[in-house]
Amino acid sequence: MKVNHAEIVISAVSKKQYPEDQLPEIALAGRSNVGKSSFINRLINRKNLARTSSKPGKTQTLNFYRINESFYFVDVPGYGYAKVSKKEREKWGRMMEEYFQTRDTLRAVVLVTDLRHDPTQDDIQMYDFIKYFDLPVIIIGTKLDKITKNKRQKHINRAKQVLEMDETDLFIPFSAEIGEGKDEAWSALSRYIKR
C-alpha cells in the first residue's frame, strides 16, 4: 500500500475521546519496546510519525494514527514493563479492555513480538486476551534481521508453538530495519481496512 497521508489524530484515555468518523481500526499490541512504533513507521515509510524511544513504557495512551484518510493504526500501551506502578498497569489494562470490548470499528489486532526470543507470559496472555474478544489477530515477529537466515524458521516455529497459535492466525516475520515482511504485512492488513 502506498501511504500518501499519515497523521496522529488523538492520544485517548477513554472512549469519549475516540475518533467518531467510523474508519476501520487496526490495534497494535505488544511488550514495551518491542517495536510497535518502528513497525508503524516502516509500514508508512516515515521515520518519526510514531515516536520511538529506548525508554520502555513511553506509550501510555491509545494513539490513533489516521492513514490515507481510510483507516487507523491504534498503538496501545506496551505491557510487561516492571518500572511502571501496579496502579498504572491496572489503569492501562482497563483502558485497553474498554477499547477491545466496545470499539465497533476495531477490525483486527496486530500482536508484535520479538522473534529473537520466545514469546513471554505477557505475550501469551495478550494473545489469549485478543482471542477471548474474538478479534482477528496477526502476529508480527520483529527484529528478523537480527536472526541468521538458517535459524529463522526455528524461531518462527518456536514462537507459534509457545503462543499455541490457531492455524487460522497469521504469523509474519518482520524487520523494521530492512523492511523485510512489509509487503506481507500490508497484504494481511488489507483485508481488514476496507470499509
From Swiss-Prot:
PANTHER family: ENGB-TYPE G DOMAIN-CONTAINING PROTEIN (PTHR11649:SF13), MSS1/TRME-RELATED GTP-BINDING PROTEIN (PTHR11649). One of its GO terms (molecular function) is GTP binding. GO terms for biological process: division septum assembly. It comes from Oceanobacillus iheyensis (strain DSM 14371 / CIP 107618 / JCM 11309 / KCTC 3954 / HTE831). The keyword Nucleotide-binding applies. This is Probable GTP-binding protein EngB. Residues 22-195 form the EngB-type G domain. SUPFAM superfamilies: P-loop containing nucleoside triphosphate hydrolases. Belongs to the TRAFAC class TrmE-Era-EngA-EngB-Septin-like GTPase superfamily. EngB GTPase family. Necessary for normal cell division and for the maintenance of normal septation. One of its GO terms (cellular component) is cytosol. GTP binds at residues 30-37, 57-61, 75-78, 142-145, 174-176. Pfam families: MMR_HSR1. Mg(2+) binds at residues 37, 59. Keywords: Cell cycle, Cell division, GTP-binding, Magnesium, Metal-binding, Nucleotide-binding, Septation. Its cofactor is Mg(2+). PROSITE patterns: G_ENGB.
